[in-house]
């Protein structure tokens, strides 16, 4: 029917309105309630219209339509008044409410006019009609002619027309009864009148129904117009609602931004709290570190005390390790050279590999460029294909638009055809119309109920969401306030605690600083005391050195006076070798010994000539001196005999590399050192072998020993001579050469070279370092002890001369002097000479010296060269500067 489907020209459909009613709960509550009220009133009006139409088709005996229409009007007015009251409570709804009120007035006027017309026609019909008809269904179900007239069968016709039965053949019947015929005729006449009246009433009813149909069609047309007006009004209402909804979304957006700002402030506060907590934790960690540092400093103090005690013990061990480290340094230098060569090889390989990588990179770049060109070409092809596809899609869209216009036109034609079909169906079947009206009524009721439930639930959900949002907002605000208050309190408490802890920490640090300052002052005072003590010790050492030099000078002058009393024969013609100027010597403990005594050129007689003159002058003297002097004079050589000055000895460490052994000594014998030059001149630009002392010092010592030998008294019965024999040690062993008891003349000079091992071991004693001597210096010595050492040497030389053992070897003499010096510096009595009961022990130990010479020299190599050695402008030691040793 027309009421069920809205007009096609209406801009707003019920489906759209129903879909708008099911909006999410986030929309405005006011708009949802107004929408629900309008839809409720619309459905109620439709329901009232359907009820009025159904009542128009009821029987006249039923209650007059007055009551139904009145009830419908009252219900409509009541629903609209309720909607008006609800809308008055809302904002911005007055205009829409007035429009709805005007629509309600129009509906009431239309309903009143239709009610008056229906009532008037019904009353006229009841006056004319003698028979009451209940409804259209009873009219359709009645059978007026069939029920009242007899059937058209033969017996019925005979009953109706008994006169005409005699015309038929058959047995004769009874004679006709005229009274019965009259009665039947009267009954037929009465029935015919009744049928005519009934037909007239039916025609009147048909006219009435036609009039009602015309009224219903007019009412439908008016309703369509009213619905269109309502659609327009609702469109304006929806526009207002949309504006209101936009304002509501703006307000919600502002609230959301405020909420985000509040959350940002809260997050910032939390970050500040976390930063403060981190700073407090860092402060606690720093405090714990300071405490740990204080404990560590206490431990370090104790450790320093222990180390101070242990350093005095480790000093000697470190000095011994220096020598081993020197060897390791040489090995490390050799390894460094090999590693440097390996590094150069690796660099060459790396350069080649880099060139290979560069070539490979160029190849990859060319390949990449080719691939890029190929991809560019393929991209252009794909672009052309995409353009063609876009053109085809555009043409397809145009065809689709044409098809859509055609479909719209066909839909319009279909709507017109449908309207015509509906009109024809309305005219053909009233029963179908009633069924559809009932179905529409039920659907409308169900839809109204469903919409009411949905709107109620939506309203409740929206109210609940709003209440929950407000409660959550209040709750969050309260929580933020409480948290901010708690955080401020905690921060204040933590700040106060932190200030207290910082004050305590500053006090402790001040106390610790004061303690350290006191300790530093004490240590500085102690250092000053140690420096003063060290200075005093240095002064004592210098004084002792001066006294020792004075004592040695006195001995030298005494020996020189003894020598000057003898006759001075002419000097024999012998090849003289100028002593090489001694290079810079490395001092002990970083100081250089200075000797103020310049050398004096005093002519000396040869040893052999002096011994012969002494023998000629004193005929009763024994010949022991003659047996010992030739070897010593040959060993000392002419340069030693020509010197008259005393030069003190200075120990010189062995700085030759450890590989210098017998092969290095073999290289020392050059072509210039021939047999005609047994004592070759040394190169003044070289220092000679680093293991040997300078030539001037060695020759001075030899001269001094020669004078001691020749001026010593000849006593054979010295009971304490055995006590002067040196004690055999682990590092150096004394060897004593046996000599025949018979005095002999000095043999001629033989041009025979001594073996390299023996030649290298003659003066190796000077290369032996002394850790005790370096550690303590000469500060512990005394002039009395130095005098005793010289007396011991003199006694030893006299013992050799008395027993007839021959000349004292220079190696044994130097070793004995070194032992005496060690025993004087150590003060522990390790090297005190003891009695040697076996006279042949010297020969056995003498044979072991060449085999022990090389390890002793290797062990004596210092680890590092001293800076004084590096800074000197003299060249290093050369193994070729000294020739062979001749006997």
Curated annotation (Swiss-Prot):
Region Required for centrosome localization, residue ranges: 360-887
Subcellular location as annotated: Cytoplasm, Cytoskeleton, Microtubule organizing center, Centrosome, Centriole
Composition-biased stretches (Polar residues): 133-153
Domain of life: Eukaryota
Chief localization: cytoplasm
Feature: compositional bias, Basic and acidic residues: 113-128, 670-680, 832-849
GO biological process: centriole replication; centrosome separation; mitotic cytokinetic process; regulation of cilium assembly
Keyword Nucleotidyltransferase among record annotations: no
Keyword Cytoplasm in record: yes
Modified residues (Phosphoserine): 81, 782
GO cellular component: centriole; centrosome; ciliary basal body; cytosol
Gene Ontology molecular function, alphabetical: protein domain specific binding
Region (Disordered) residue spans: 1-34, 110-153, 465-486, 566-591, 636-695, 824-887
UniProt keyword annotations, A-Z: Cell cycle, Cell division, Coiled coil, Cytoplasm, Cytoskeleton, Phosphoprotein
InterPro entries the UniProt entry points to: Centrobin
Recorded coiled-coil stretches: 191-557
Role summary: Required for centriole duplication. Inhibition of centriole duplication leading to defects in cytokinesis.
Alphabetical list of PANTHER family matching this protein: CENTROBIN
Quaternary assembly: Interacts with LYST.
Designated name of the protein: Centrobin
Native source organism of the sequence: Mus musculus
Lineage: Eukaryota, Metazoa, Chordata, Craniata, Vertebrata
Gene from which the chain derives: Cntrob
């Amino acid at each position: 029917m027309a009421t069920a489907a809205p007009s096609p020209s209406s801009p707003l459909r019920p489906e759209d309105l129903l879909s708008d009613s099911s909006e999410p709960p986030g929309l405005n509550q006011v708009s949802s309630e107004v929408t629900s009220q309008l839809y409720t009133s619309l459905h109620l009006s439709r329901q009232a219209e359907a009820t009025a139409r159904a009542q128009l088709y009821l029987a006249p005996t039923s209650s007059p339509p007055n009551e139904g229409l009145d009830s419908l009007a009252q219900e409509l007015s009541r629903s609209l008044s309720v909607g008006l009251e609800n809308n008055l409570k809302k904002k911005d709804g007055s205009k829409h409410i007035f429009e709805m009120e005007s629509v309600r007035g129009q509906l009431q006027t239309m309903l009143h006019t239709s009610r008056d017309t229906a009532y008037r026609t019904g009353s006229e019909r009841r006056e004319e009609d003698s028979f009451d008809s209940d409804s259209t269904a009873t009219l359709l179900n009645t059978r007026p002619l069939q029920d009242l007239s007899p059937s058209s069968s033969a017996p019925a016709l005979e009953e109706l027309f008994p006169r005409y039965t005699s015309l038929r053949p058959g047995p004769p019947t009874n004679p006709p009864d005229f009274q019965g015929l009259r009665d039947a005729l009267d009954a037929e006449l009465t029935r015919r009148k009744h049928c005519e009246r009934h037909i007239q009433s039916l025609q009147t009813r048909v006219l009435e129904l036609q009039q009602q149909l015309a009224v219903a069609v007019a009412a439908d047309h008016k309703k369509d117009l009213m619905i269109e007006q309502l659609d327009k009004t609702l469109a304006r209402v929806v526009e207002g609602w949309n504006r209101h909804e936009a304002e509501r979304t703006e307000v919600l957006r502002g609230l959301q931004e405020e909420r985000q700002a509040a959350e940002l402030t809260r997050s910032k506060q939390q970050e500040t709290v976390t930063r403060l907590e981190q700073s407090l934790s860092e402060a606690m960690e720093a405090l714990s570190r300071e405490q740990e540092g204080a404990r560590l400093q206490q431990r370090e103090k104790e450790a320093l005390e222990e180390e101070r005690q242990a350093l005095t013990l480790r000093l000697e061990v470190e000095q011994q390790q220096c020598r081993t480290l020197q060897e390791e340094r040489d090995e490390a230098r050799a390894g460094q050279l090999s590693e440097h060569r390996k590094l150069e090889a690796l660099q060459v390989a790396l350069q080649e590999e880099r060139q290979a990588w560069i070539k490979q990179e160029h190849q990859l770049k060319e390949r990449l460029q080719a691939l890029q060109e190929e991809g560019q070409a393929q991209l252009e092809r794909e672009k052309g294909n995409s353009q063609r596809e876009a053109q085809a899609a555009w043409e397809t869209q145009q065809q689709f638009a044409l098809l859509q216009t055609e479909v719209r036109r066909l839909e319009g034609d279909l709507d017109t055809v449908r309207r015509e079909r509906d009109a024809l169906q309305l005219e053909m079947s009233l029963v179908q119309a009633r069924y559809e009206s009932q179905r529409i009524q039920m659907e409308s009721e169900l839809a109204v109920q469903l919409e009411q439930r949905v709107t109620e639930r939506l309203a409740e959900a929206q109210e609940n969401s709003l209440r929950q949002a407000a409660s959550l907002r209040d709750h969050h605000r309260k929580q933020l306030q409480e948290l901010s208050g708690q955080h401020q309190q905690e921060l204040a408490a933590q700040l106060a605690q932190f200030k207290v802890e910082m004050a305590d920490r500053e006090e402790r640090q001040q106390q610790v600083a004061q303690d350290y300052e006191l300790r530093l002052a004490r240590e500085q005072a102690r250092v000053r005391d140690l420096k003063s003590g060290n200075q005093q010790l240095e002064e004592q050492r210098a004084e002792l050195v001066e006294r020792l030099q004075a004592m040695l000078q006195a001995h030298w002058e005494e020996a020189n006076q003894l020598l000057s009393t003898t006759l001075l024969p002419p000097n024999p013609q012998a090849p003289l070798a100028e002593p090489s100027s001694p290079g810079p010597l490395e001092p002990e403990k970083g100081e250089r010994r200075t000797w103020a005594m310049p050398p004096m050129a005093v002519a000396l007689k040869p040893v052999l000539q002096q011994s012969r003159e002494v023998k000629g002058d004193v005929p009763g003297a024994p010949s022991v001196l003659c047996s010992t002097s030739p070897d010593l004079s040959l060993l000392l050589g002419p340069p030693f005999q020509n010197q008259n000055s005393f030069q003190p000895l200075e120990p010189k460490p062995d700085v030759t590399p450890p590989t210098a052994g017998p092969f290095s000594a073999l290289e020392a014998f050059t072509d210039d050192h021939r047999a005609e030059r047994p004592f070759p001149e040394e190169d003044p630009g070289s220092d000679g072998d680093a293991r040997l002392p300078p030539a001037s010092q060695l020759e001075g010592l030899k001269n001094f020993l020669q004078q001691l030998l020749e001026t010593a008294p000849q006593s054979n019965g010295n009971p304490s001579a055995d006590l002067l024999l040196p004690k055999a040690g682990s590092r150096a062993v004394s060897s004593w050469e046996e000599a025949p008891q018979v005095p002999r003349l000095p043999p001629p000079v033989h041009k025979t070279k001594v073996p390299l091992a023996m030649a290298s071991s003659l003066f190796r004693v000077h290369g032996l370092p002394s850790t005790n001597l370096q550690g303590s210096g000469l500060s512990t010595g005394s002039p009395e002890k130095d005098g005793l050492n010289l007396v011991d040497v003199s006694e030893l030389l006299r013992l050799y001369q008395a027993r007839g053992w021959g000349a004292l070897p220079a190696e044994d003499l130097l070793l004995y002097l070194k032992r005496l010096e060690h025993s004087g510096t150590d003060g522990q009595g390790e090297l005190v000479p003891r009695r040697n009961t076996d006279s042949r022990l010297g020969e056995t130990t003498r044979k072991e010296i060449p085999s022990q010479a090389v390890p002793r020299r290797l062990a004596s190599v210092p680890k590092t060269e001293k800076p004084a050695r590096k800074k000197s402008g003299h060249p290093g030691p050369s193994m070729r500067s000294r020739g062979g040793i001749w006997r």
